[in-house]
Amino acid sequence: MIKYFGILITIFVFSCNAPKKNSLSENNLEMAQSFLDNIITNPEKAKSLLHKDFTFAWMGIIEQGGKIWNKENLFDEYFKNIIPEILPNGIVLKTLDAISDDNGVAIIQEGDAVGKNGEYDNKYVWVFKMKDGLIHSIREYNSDILVATQLYNYKLINTEK
């Protein structure tokens, strides 16, 4: 009996010390955050997290809105040419909250930047869908009004008389 008790205690101790495995939901969240953390500073790392059929779209209704970008042109054109033109001094993004499950992630962020036309402190929601253990798609949501006025120099006009 004492022999069996010793075996049970040994099994219990080793099972308590086993490294915790992350759930698929936690892995998805880590991958999405890693992508956002590396898109400018380490684009090759960010790109390595993307599925071969990856798509990205900013969901605004003005310039660039709804355009579908792929794994190649997202980095070669969008992040290399378009973003530096409208955010010449870059942007600091702070994650406020996140939701994840086995199929995807939503990350809520607040930005701190000066756009080419003035202060640009937008709020963001990034919706990630996962496939085959990689990021399959990202949709970016934020304020069209701030994008239009502070990045593209649109003027707001009061149409009520």
Stretch-by-stretch model annotation:
Residues I2, I11-F12, C16-E44, S48, ...:
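Short, low-complexity N-terminal intrinsically disordered segments enriched in polar/charged residues
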Residues A32-F35, K45-K47, F54, L74-F75, ...:
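Hydrophobic pocket/interface hotspot
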Residues K52-D101:
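A solvent-exposed, acidic/Ser-Thr-rich amphipathic alpha-helical stretch
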Residues I68, N117-Y120, V147-Y152:
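A short, polar/proline- and glycine-enriched secondary-structure boundary/capping micro-motif
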Residues L93-A98, G111-D112, K123-F128:
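Hydrophobic/aromatic beta-strand elements that line small-molecule binding cavities or substrate pockets
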Residues D102-G111:
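A short hydrophobic beta-strand element
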Residues A113-G115, D132:
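Beta-strand elements of well-folded, non-transmembrane domains
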Residues R139-K161:
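Low-complexity, intrinsically disordered terminal/linker segments enriched in charged
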